[in-house]
């Protein structure tokens, strides 16, 4: 067993022997301040990774656009098919120029040779490549099948209805392509620590998230040296922004954090800054 596999296998073990965790309302004060600064709703939840206990939450059962955070769930569904012998990570998928959609920095470079399922998941999570996500959605049967996968996990809230990039439209009061912070946090925890996926697939999923290259201005910008984070960000229309993450000190994750916002007129930089400040408060009061 590799060191990384050992780390993920012992996530519940280490967490069980940690000192009790206590909620700190100071972080919620910052979440509410972010709402004021952005002029928009902000949803927040913080779960203990081992027990699933909610440590703090704000608007945990209000719907927010998922945006690209759905790509972690998508690759979880792909990995479940791999575990069941219905898919192979090494299978190569070929596609054409007509398949390319807006923001496809990886797939646009491989029109000639195609990409493997493993490479597509890596591109979808680490670079948020939209064509990679659409190609992977095709392998599982489309958005409705991802929703069905989530329902089978016990998540009857999260739903995907459309493809990239239309799913980022974020129309107010439109339930399409949305989740709730509580539902997303619980589902992410199941994917990373539950028995739904094999140990190898859980490790692969967290490795992809740990290698995320496009979430630097968010929670990662607030992390002290030595902290662990595996995350996936999302951005959408109407001032929408979000991030889902597993993080913790001492090089291992111990909490799940989900943050979503929508309806702001603020710039992307300002949305990023507010999420980073929430992260800084979380870490300060850990």
Curated annotation (Swiss-Prot):
Chemical reaction(s) catalysed: a beta-lactam + H2O = a substituted beta-amino acid
Phenotype for residue 162 to S: In TEM-5, TEM-8 and TEM-24
Signal peptide residues on this chain, from the entry's feature table: 1-23
UniProt-annotated binding residues for substrate: 232-234
InterPro entries the UniProt entry points to: Beta-lactam/transpept-like, Beta-lactam_cat, Beta-lactam_class-A, Beta-lactam_class-A_AS
A GO biological process held by the record: beta-lactam antibiotic catabolic process
Residues at the active site: 68 (acyl-ester intermediate), 166 (proton acceptor)
Keyword check for Signal: yes
EC number from the UniProt entry: 3.5.2.6
Keywords associated with the record: Antibiotic resistance, Disulfide bond, Hydrolase, Plasmid, Signal, Transposable element
Pfam short name (any one): Beta-lactamase2
GO molecular function: beta-lactamase activity
Cystine crosslinks: 75-121
Applied biotechnology: This protein is used as a marker in many commonly used cloning vectors, such as pBR322 and the pUC series.
Functional description taken from the UniProt entry: TEM-type are the most prevalent beta-lactamases in enterobacteria; they hydrolyze the beta-lactam bond in susceptible beta-lactam antibiotics, thus conferring resistance to penicillins and cephalosporins. TEM-3 and TEM-4 are capable of hydrolyzing cefotaxime and ceftazidime. TEM-5 is capable of hydrolyzing ceftazidime. TEM-6 is capable of hydrolyzing ceftazidime and aztreonam. TEM-8/CAZ-2, TEM-16/CAZ-7 and TEM-24/CAZ-6 are markedly active against ceftazidime. IRT-4 shows resistance to beta-lactamase inhibitors.
UniProt family annotation: Belongs to the class-A beta-lactamase family.
Additional notes on this entry: The beta-lactamase present on pBR322 was cloned from plasmid R1 (R7268).
Protein known as: Beta-lactamase TEM
Organism of provenance: Escherichia coli
Gene transcribed to yield this protein: bla
């Amino acid at each position: 067993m590799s060191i990384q596999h050992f780390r993920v296998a012992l996530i519940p073990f280490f967490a069980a022997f940690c000192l009790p965790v206590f909620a700190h309302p100071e972080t919620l004060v910052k979440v509410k301040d972010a709402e004021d600064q952005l002029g928009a709703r902000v949803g927040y939840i913080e779960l203990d990774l081992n027990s699933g206990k909610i440590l703090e939450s704000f608007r945990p059962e209000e719907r927010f656009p998922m945006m690209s955070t759905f790509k972690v769930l998508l690759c979880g569904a792909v990995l479940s098919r791999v575990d069941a012998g219905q898919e192979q990570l090494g299978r190569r998928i070929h596609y054409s120029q007509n398949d390319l959609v807006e923001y496809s920095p990886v797939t646009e470079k491989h029109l000639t040779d195609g990409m493997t399922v493993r490479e597509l998941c890596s591109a979808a999570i680490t670079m948020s490549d939209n064509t990679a996500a659409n190609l992977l959605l095709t392998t599982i049967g489309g958005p409705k099948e991802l929703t069905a996968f989530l329902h089978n996990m016990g998540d009857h809230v999260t739903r995907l209805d459309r493809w990239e990039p239309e799913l980022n439209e974020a129309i107010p009061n439109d339930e399409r392509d949305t989740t709730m912070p509580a539902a997303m946090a619980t589902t992410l925890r199941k994917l990373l620590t539950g028995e739904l996926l094999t140990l190898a697939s859980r490790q692969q999923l967290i490795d992809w998230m740990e290698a995320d290259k496009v979430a630097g201005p968010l929670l990662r910008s607030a992390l002290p040296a030595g902290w662990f984070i595996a995350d996936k960000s999302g951005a959408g229309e109407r001032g929408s922004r979000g991030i889902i993450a597993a993080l913790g000190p001492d090089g291992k994750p111990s909490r799940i954090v989900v943050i979503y916002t929508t309806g702001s007129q603020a710039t992307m930089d300002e949305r990023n800054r507010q999420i980073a400040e929430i992260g800084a408060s979380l870490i300060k009061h850990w």
